[in-house]
Swiss-Prot record:
Protein name in UniProt: Sulfite efflux pump SSU1
Bilayer topology term: Multi-pass membrane protein
Induction conditions: Expression is strongly increased during growth on protein rich medium containing keratin or cystine-arginine.
Family: Belongs to the tellurite-resistance/dicarboxylate transporter (TDT) family.
Record has Amino-acid biosynthesis as a keyword: no
Topological domains, Cytoplasmic: 1-25, 81-101, 157-167, 222-234, 299-309, 365-375
Subcellular location as annotated: Cell membrane
Membrane-traversing stretches: 26-46, 60-80, 102-122, 136-156, 168-188, 201-221, 235-255, 278-298, 310-330, 344-364
PANTHER family, per the entry: PTHR31686, SULFITE EFFLUX PUMP SSU1 (PTHR31686:SF1)
Organism field: Arthroderma benhamiae (strain ATCC MYA-4681 / CBS 112371) (Trichophyton mentagrophytes)
């Protein structure tokens, strides 16, 4: 039997192994982990704005919001630690054809926190919380635009890629400004200063115009890839849901910006007297078209999932956010059209997203504890 010192040596070796595993986890951390923020944040937003509320639902949304903030700052701290200890890993990440695409998850996860501040904190804390959210939004918008402009150019000049290896993850850096534009509409609606709201929504329309058409181009290329080379590998099959992200969030953003434009434009005598109504109606019209386009991509994704087994990885968080933002467009149409159909459908989608969040979050915690996700 081992002596006392032998037991001590075994315990010391085990402690060193655990510390080594922790450093390996930090070393292997990548931006895709911020998709946890995206999924958690959109679930909180859906529950907070569910068309059919019940007692206690608001507090569940608040708990998810707080959890999301904690996770965000935890991941941000890990990321800063990683790149401070291993500066070369940042350059390697930018040069990586897959990991660089995941940069877009950072501002999109941050945007869900900003939206929750508006939905949850502003009604309680008042105008200063709205101004605080507005300040955070400008940071998010700047980061989103930088990623949208920089990463696709890296794809053109530095990355080695082919049509066969393409996945829908190419959309992630491009969708970031779409999410920021939609978030800007939410923030602008809470601002009491009409001039600030006007500036915000005009910037949002420009961001929307920069990103949504480019996302449509990527969708065309992605469809060609699927038609020629068939479905993506099973490890990446969950990414089949990503195309509904820019369509759902783009539609929601246009409707939300139209709501603010309808209110703010006449007050500031901006453009013609009916300009706000035109922006509102056109936003709803285009949003319906984008929502319909999203339906067929949702069908493609669901049909793809039935083609075989696939195993858990961090990419499973794609089950939550794309469908979540598609749901926000659905519930917004129910609100603007006064439609029970869209209210019920939005509620159904919200329940599905919440159930998927519970499943994926539980698996993520379990696989993180076993270190399987960091190998």
């Amino acid at each position: 039997m081992p002596s006392g010192s032998g037991f001590h040596n075994i315990e010391e070796a085990g402690e060193k192994a655990r510390k080594r595993d922790d450093w390996i986890a930090i070393s292997n951390f990548h931006p895709g982990w911020f998709s946890v923020n995206m999924g958690t944040g959109i679930t909180a937003i859906l529950l907070q704005n569910l068309p059919y509320q019940f007692p206690g639902l608001h507090y569940i949304a608040v708990i998810l919001f707080i959890l999301n903030v904690i996770i965000f700052f935890l991941f941000l701290t890990i990321s800063i630690t990683r790149y401070c200890l291993w500066p070369d890993k940042f350059k390697a990440m930018l040069a990586h054809p897959a990991h660089s695409m995941l940069l877009g998850t950072f501002p999109m996860g941050f945007a869900t926190i900003i939206n929750c501040i508006v939905f949850i904190c502003v009604p309680v804390w008042g105008e200063w919380a709205s101004r605080f959210a507005w300040g955070l939004w400008w940071i998010d918008a700047a980061v989103s635009v930088a990623i949208c402009y920089f990463v696709p150019f890296m794809l053109m000049t530095k990355h080695t890629s082919s049509l066969e290896t393409m996945t829908a993850a190419w959309l992630l850096p491009i969708v970031a400004p779409v999410v920021a534009a939609a978030s800007g509409g939410v923030v602008a609606d809470s601002l009491q200063n009409d001039t600030h709201a006007l500036i915000t929504i005009l910037v949002c329309y420009v961001m929307w115009g920069s990103a949504v058409p480019l996302a449509m181009v990527i969708l065309v290329i992605y469809f060609q890839r699927l038609a020629i080379h068939k479905l993506v590998p099973r490890a990446a099959i969950v990414s089949a849901l990503l195309p509904i992200g820019p369509l759902g969030q783009g539609g929601f953003g246009l409707m939300q910006l139209g709501v603010v434009a309808k209110r703010v434009f006449p007050r500031l005598d901006f453009l013609a007297p009916i300009a706000g109504d035109i922006f509102y109606v056109m936003g709803a019209f285009i949003a319906m078209i984008m929502w319909g386009f999203g339906l067929i991509w949702l069908w493609f994704a669901l049909a793809s999932f039935t083609r075989g087994k696939f195993y858990f990885n961090i990419g499973w968080w794609a089950f939550t956010f794309p469908l979540g933002v598609f749901t926000t467009a659905t519930t917004q149409m129910g609100k603007e059209f006064n439609s029970p159909f869209f209210d019920i459908l939005g509620t159904f989608f919200s329940i599905v997203v919440t159930c998927m969040w519970v499943l994926v979050f539980a698996l993520t915690v379990y696989k993180s504890c076993t270190k399987e996700l960091f190998r």
